[in-house]
Design a protein with these regions (language model features):
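Well-ordered mid-protein domain cores that form the structural environment of catalytic cofactors
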Residues: 143-248
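Short Gly/Ser/Thr- and Asp/Glu-enriched loop/turn motifs at secondary-structure junctions
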Residues: 191-192, 476-483
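Active-site C-terminal subdomain of aminotransferase-like
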Residues: 295, 299, 346-478, 489-492
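Conserved PLP-enzyme active-site core in the AAT-like
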Residues: 200-203, 207, 211-400
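Glycine- and acidic
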Residues: 102, 158-166, 189-196, 225-229, ...
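N-terminal entrance/gating region of PLP-dependent enzymes' catalytic architecture
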Residues: 32-192
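Conserved PLP-binding active-site segment of the aspartate aminotransferase-like
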Residues: 299, 482-501
Length: 501
């Protein structure tokens, strides 16, 4: 009934009203006159004031949200420094709270003033990093692009909840089309690809582990983890491995680390084979093998194509499912834009100096097609606001069936896409999916290629400048990523000689 009333403009039946029109008008007038003579109760005064400051659901009416956004633009500008100013927001870089004493606070009895509350919100950003400032140097926290910011904000205005179809409606296209676009980028069948926007790179890692546990231990959905299945990852894998293994109930002791090459930071596939051979002999199952496809600083890529071949040679013992190969590409994913770049024609006119690096990175990411699932952060090398992380999986039908619990939720299915049945979260904001989707649409392939290549051009320009300074030395000149690490010594010290010591 609710659905029919909200989706269709159906006229009420003739007997819908209990009173005839003249009688209902008289009754309403009498009721209004009586109410006008009585004082408004306090709760109604509070409610009236609060309701007047909520966003308007209708066009052409006074909208408190629009008014506050206008004021917000002015507040935003006050936080920004003048050009050439410091790398932080506002005027005070100090931390203005003490821990844990900051928590010794109570809720006010009286209702607050909207302008005052929003002024206090702005004050919270005093001293915060200004990611768009050229003086701000942090590894992978870029400024969000405008398309993604506005898209994300729209979700907050209309509270799109992407747990199921009726609460999201066409907003679900952002997540579904992301799956198709990224599936195409990776080299999978886009229609068979699925994705879930989740709480960060840690969420992607956790989903990758959960996928492996559910596929390898079929009874675990109902009976829990009763077998010490193993997680295999390199020594360079992200520390979230500990969070994911602990929270999934498998335990950190079941993480097995593969040695990495000292020069390349890549997984040693010979050692990987030794580990898999040993586990197979002991009849110990492997849940998930994780390839790190782009470490934060060194931008190292594990040879995932070779890992796939070795993993397939050592299947799990009888009675267990096939292990999942998860690619942790939350940092390195966007290099996949160069796997099909025409390096001979070089349409974006990159310098010869960086073409080889772009090709090297693109070739490494071309191997993502061998993965069962890939983790992607748009809020890192995607220039989208936090949090917009995407867990991408190759076989949507398998993943969703494996994780679909039996029965139905009390929410009725009204659309073909209802991820609430198999996601770790239930309620999910559309902010991340809209930000990621808007970024993909806005940048396109050439835009992303241009911004990535442009950073490399700048990186090597900085590298040349550092070489001219005797008291400075670049310590990662051979890395192929976006990060430049350098040391600064006192003026009278030969930086290169000192660093070699």
């Amino acid at each position: 009934v609710k659905h029919e009333q909200t989706r269709k403009k159906t006229a009420p039946p003739a007997n819908h009203q209990a009173l005839s029109k003249p009688e209902s008008v008289k009754a309403a007038s009498a009721k209004t006159e009586h109410a006008a003579n009585e004082p408004m109760p306090k709760w109604a005064k509070y409610r009236s004031e609060m309701a007047s400051e909520f966003p308007s659901p209708f066009r052409g009416t006074k909208d408190p949200l629009a008014e506050q956004i206008g004021k917000f633009v002015s507040r935003l500008d006050q936080l920004r420094p003048e050009e050439g100013g410091p790398a932080f927001l506002g005027k005070n870089p100090a931390l203005t709270y003490e821990y844990p004493g900051v928590k010794n606070i109570e809720i006010n009895q009286e209702m607050g003033d909207l302008d005052t509350v929003l002024d206090d919100v702005v004050k919270l950003f005093e001293g915060a990093p200004n990611w768009g400032n050229p003086l701000t140097m942090c590894n992978v926290i870029p400024q969000g692009n405008t398309a993604a910011i506005i898209a994300s904000m729209l979700s907050q205005v209309f509270s799109a909840n992407i747990l199921e179809g009726e609460y999201a409606w066409n907003v679900h296209r952002a997540e579904l089309e992301t799956a198709g676009m990224l599936g195409n980028l990776v080299g999978w069948d886009p229609v068979k690809t699925g994705c879930i926007y989740t709480w960060g790179g840690g969420g992607c890692w956790t989903y990758g582990l959960k996928y492996g546990l559910t596929r390898v231990l079929p009874d675990s959905m109902a009976k829990g983890i009763r077998t010490d299945a193993k997680i295999i990852c390199s020594q360079q894998a992200h520390f979230v491995q500990k969070n994911a293994s602990a929270w999934m109930g498998l335990g950190m002791d079941n993480i097995v680390h593969v040695r990495t090459d000292e020069k390349t930071n890549q997984m040693d596939v010979t050692h990987l084979e030794e580990i898999l051979k040993d586990l197979a002999a002991k009849k110990i199952p492997v849940a998930t093998v994780v390839c790190t496809m782009g470490t934060t600083d060194a931008s190292a890529f594990d040879p995932i194509g070779k890992v796939r071949k070795i993993l397939d040679r050592y299947p799990n013992p009888k009675g267990y499912g096939k292990a999942i190969l998860y690619a942790d590409a939350v940092v390195g994913w966007s290099w996949a834009y160069f796997k099909d770049y025409d390096f001979a024609k070089n349409p974006l006119e990159f310098s010869e100096r960086i073409l080889l690096i772009l090709k090297q990175n693109g070739n490494a990411m071309a191997e993502l097609e061998y993965a069962d699932a890939v983790g992607i952060d748009f809020h890192k090398v995607g220039w989208a606001p936090y949090v917009s992380s995407c867990f991408l999986y190759k076989n949507a039908e398998e993943f969703e069936k494996l994780h679909h619990w039996a029965g139905d939720a009390y929410l009725q299915v009204r659309t073909p896409y209802n991820p609430m049945y198999y996601t770790l979260e239930v309620s999910r904001t559309a902010s991340g999916s809209l930000a990621g989707w808007a970024t993909l649409k806005y940048f396109g392939k050439s835009g992303m290629q241009a911004i990535l290549g442009g950073i490399l051009e700048t990186k090597y320009y900085l590298y040349d400048l550092l070489k001219q300074q005797k008291d400075m030395v670049c310590v990662n000149p051979d890395d192929s990523g976006l990060i430049t690490l350098f040391r600064v010594y006192p003026k009278d010290v030969d930086a290169t000689a000192q660093y070699k010591k």
